[in-house]
C-alpha cells in the first residue's frame, strides 16, 4: 500500500459503507500510506477514551465550566442523569406538538388567522443551523415560509420587514439566544418589536424564545407573555445546537420528520462510537484531515456538495470546523495556532470558478465532494438528457482531474437527501471535529477568540457613545483632541467611529479632508 491517489486496492481497503445509513466514505484520494494511517491507531485509543468521558458528562468546555451534551440530544438514555433525559424527551414532544398545532391551525394569531411565516432571529449556529434545515429539506408550499435575520445590517432588517409587511400579523418571530445577552439578536429583536408596536401589530403573542431557563431572554419572554418559550440547555453550544430546539423547531414548522432527523444523527453517533478505528467513519475522516495537513492544518478544506439543496452546508461546516479547531493554544498552554480553513459553494457551479486554481494553482487544500444518488420523482426528464447523470459525471470528472495532478480529495456519498441522512451527515462531521481536536490536543468546545472579539466590540460601542456625547455637548474636535480625552492608543478606532457617524450626515460640520485624518475637525450642528 502506498500514497497513490489512483490505487484501486487503496480505494477498496479504505472505502467505508453502512447499510443502515446508506452512506459511503472514501478517503483513498488523500495522500497517505498504510503505515502512516496505522500509526494513528495508538493515538485513537486516547481519542476514543476522551470522547467516552465527554459523553459521560465530563466538563469539556473548561472556560465556561460546562458539560458538552449535544450527543445526549439524539439519545437521551446516555445522558448522565434521568432528569436530563426526561427534559430532552419533553422538549422534543413539546416542539413536535407545537408544530402540529401551528400547521393545522389549532394555534392562531390574535385575529384568529393561521400563521403563514417565520422571521428567525439568531446569529452563528443559531442562524446557520435553521437555515441549513430549511434550505436542505423544505419542500415547495409545505409548512411556513422562513426568513432570517442573522446580522444587524440595517438594510437586511429593513428589507425583511418590507418583504413581510403584508404578512407581519401572521408571522412568528423566533428569537434565539442562549444567554439573552448576545447583542445582534437582541438589537434586531428590539427593532422589530418596536416596528410592530408602532404599526399596531402584535409582537408578544407572535413571539417565541429559544433560550436557557432564567436567562435575560427567558425573563423578558415570560414577563411579556410571549407565545412560547423553548429550552436551550447550557450544555449545548451554538455550533452543535442543530439537534436541539434550535434545529427541531424549524423541522416542525416546515412539516418535516423530527424523529427521522434525530434517528439519523443517533445512528451515525453509534457508528462513530465504535473503537474499531478502520470501521469508524469519523476516525477515518479526521485521520484524513490530520494526515493531509500534517497535523497542523496546513491545507484548506474545500467543500463541494453536488446538490443545490446542500449549498448552505459549506457555510455550516465553516463555523463548525473553524470555530472548533481554530485555537492559539493547546491544552498544555503551548502556542500551536491550530485550525483548518473551510470554504466552498456547490458543484458543478464551482467547476466554472475556483476549481481552475485547485487543479493548476497552489496545492494548499483538499476537497470534500458530497454526492447524492437519488433523482426527483417526476416525469419531466423522460426521454431527455438526465441532469443527474451529467451532475455525477461532472463530480467524477473533477475528482479525476484533481487526482491526476496529485490534488487530494475525500468523497461522501448519500443515497438521498432527507431528514435522516442530513442528521447523519451533520453527526459525522461533529464527531470528526471532536476527534481531530483530540489528535492535536486542543479544546474543540471553547471559543476564546470569539469572546475576545465580543469584548473588543463592546469597547468600541462604549467609545461610540462617548464620542456622540462629546459632540452633542458642543464644540469642535479633531481626532487628536478626542483621543487625548479618552485614550491615545485608539486614534484609528475614533476615525472609524467619526466616519460612520458623520460622513454624509448633515447634522455634522466636517472641516478638512477624509483622506487626511489629521486634518479633520468635526462639530455637531444645532438641530
Swiss-Prot record:
The keyword Cytoplasm applies. It is an enzyme of class 5 (isomerase). Keywords: Cytoplasm, Gluconeogenesis, Glycolysis, Isomerase. GO terms for cellular component: cytosol. PROSITE patterns: P_GLUCOSE_ISOMERASE_2, P_GLUCOSE_ISOMERASE_3. It catalyses: alpha-D-glucose 6-phosphate = beta-D-fructose 6-phosphate. It comes from the Bacteria. It holds the Pfam family PGI. Its EC number is 5.3.1.9. It is found in: Cytoplasm. GO terms for biological process: gluconeogenesis; glucose 6-phosphate metabolic process; glycolytic process. One of its GO terms (molecular function) is monosaccharide binding. Pathway: Carbohydrate biosynthesis; gluconeogenesis; Carbohydrate degradation; glycolysis; D-glyceraldehyde 3-phosphate and glycerone phosphate from D-glucose: step 2/4. The active site is at residues 323, 352, 454. Its main location: cytoplasm. Belongs to the GPI family. Catalyzes the reversible isomerization of glucose-6-phosphate to fructose-6-phosphate. NCBIfam families: PRK14096.1 (NF010696). HAMAP family: G6P_isomerase. This is Glucose-6-phosphate isomerase. It comes from Prochlorococcus marinus (strain MIT 9301).
Amino acid at each position: 500500500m502506498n500514497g497513490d491517489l489512483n490505487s484501486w486496492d487503496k480505494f477498496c481497503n479504505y472505502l467505508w459503507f453502512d447499510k443502515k445509513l446508506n452512506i459511503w466514505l472514501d478517503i483513498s484520494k488523500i495522500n497517505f500510506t498504510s503505515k502512516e494511517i496505522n500509526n494513528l491507531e495508538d493515538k485513537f485509543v486516547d481519542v476514543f477514551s476522551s470522547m467516552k468521558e465527554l459523553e459521560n458528562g465530563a466538563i469539556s468546555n473548561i472556560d465556561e465550566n460546562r458539560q458538552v451534551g449535544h450527543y445526549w440530544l439524539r439519545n437521551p438514555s446516555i445522558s448522565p442523569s434521568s432528569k436530563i433525559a426526561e427534559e430532552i424527551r419533553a422538549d422534543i414532544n413539546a416542539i413536535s406538538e407545537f408544530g402540529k398545532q401551528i400547521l393545522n391551525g389549532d394555534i392562531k394569531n390574535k385575529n384568529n388567522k393561521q400563521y403563514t411565516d417565520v422571521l428567525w432571529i439568531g446569529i452563528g449556529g443559531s442562524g446557520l443551523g435553521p437555515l441549513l434545515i430549511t434550505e436542505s429539506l423544505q419542500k415547495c408550499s409545505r409548512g411556513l415560509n422562513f426568513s432570517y435575520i442573522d446580522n444587524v445590517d440595517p438594510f437586511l432588517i429593513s428589507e425583511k420587514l418590507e418583504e413581510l409587511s403584508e404578512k407581519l400579523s401572521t408571522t412568528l418571530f423566533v428569537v434565539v439566544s442562549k444567554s439573552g445577552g448576545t447583542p445582534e439578536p437582541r438589537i434586531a429583536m428590539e427593532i422589530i418589536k418596536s416596528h410592530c408596536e408602532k404599526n399596531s401589530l402584535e409582537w408578544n403573542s407572535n413571539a417565541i424564545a429559544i433560550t436557557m431557563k432564567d436567562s435575560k431572554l427567558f425573563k423578558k419572554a415570560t414577563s411579556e407573555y410571549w407565545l412560547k418559550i423553548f429550552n436551550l440547555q447550557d450544555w449545548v453550544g451554538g455550533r452543535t445546537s442543530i439537534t436541539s430546539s434550535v434545529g427541531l423547531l424549524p423541522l416542525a414548522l416546515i412539516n418535516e420528520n423530527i424523529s427521522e432527523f434525530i434517528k439519523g444523527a443517533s445512528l451515525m453517533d453509534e457508528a462513530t462510537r465504535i473503537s474499531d478505528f478502520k470501521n469508524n467513519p469519523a476516525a477515518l475522516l479526521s485521520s484524513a484531515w490530520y494526515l493531509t495537513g500534517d497535523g497542523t492544518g496546513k491545507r484548506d478544506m474545500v467543500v463541494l456538495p453536488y446538490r443545490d439543496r446542500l449549498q448552505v452546508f459549506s457555510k455550516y461546516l465553516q463555523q463548525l470546523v473553524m470555530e472548533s479547531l481554530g485555537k492559539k493554544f493547546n491544552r498544555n498552554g503551548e502556542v500551536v495556532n491550530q485550525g483548518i480553513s473551510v470554504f466552498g459553494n456547490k458543484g458543478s457551479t464551482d467547476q466554472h470558478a475556483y476549481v481552475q486554481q485547485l487543479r493548476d494553482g497552489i496545492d494548499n487544500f483538499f476537497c470534500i465532494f458530497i454526492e447524492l444518488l437519488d433523482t426527483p420523482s417526476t416525469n419531466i426528464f423522460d426521454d431527455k438528457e438526465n441532469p443527474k447523470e451529467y451532475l455525477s459525471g461532472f463530480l467524477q470528472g473533477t475528482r479525476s482531474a484533481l487526482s491526476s495532478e496529485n490534488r487530494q480529495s475525500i468523497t461522501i456519498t448519500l443515497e438521498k437527501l432527507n431528514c435522516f441522512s442530513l442528521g447523519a451527515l451533520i453527526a459525522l462531521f461533529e464527531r470528526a471535529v471532536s476527534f481531530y481536536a483530540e489528535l492535536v490536543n486542543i479544546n474543540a468546545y471553547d471559543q476564546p477568540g470569539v469572546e475576545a472579539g465580543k469584548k473588543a466590540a463592546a469597547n468600541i460601542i462604549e467609545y461610540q457613545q462617548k464620542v456622540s456625547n462629546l459632540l452633542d455637548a458642543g464644540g469642535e474636535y479633531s481626532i487628536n483632541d478626542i483621543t487625548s480625552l479618552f485614550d491615545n492608543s485608539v486614534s484609528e478606532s475614533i476615525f472609524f467611529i467619526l466616519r460612520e457617524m458623520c460622513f454624509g450626515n448633515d447634522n455634522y460640520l466636517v472641516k478638512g479632508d477624509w483622506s487626511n485624518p489629521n486634518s479633520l475637525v468635526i462639530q455637531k450642528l444645532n438641530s
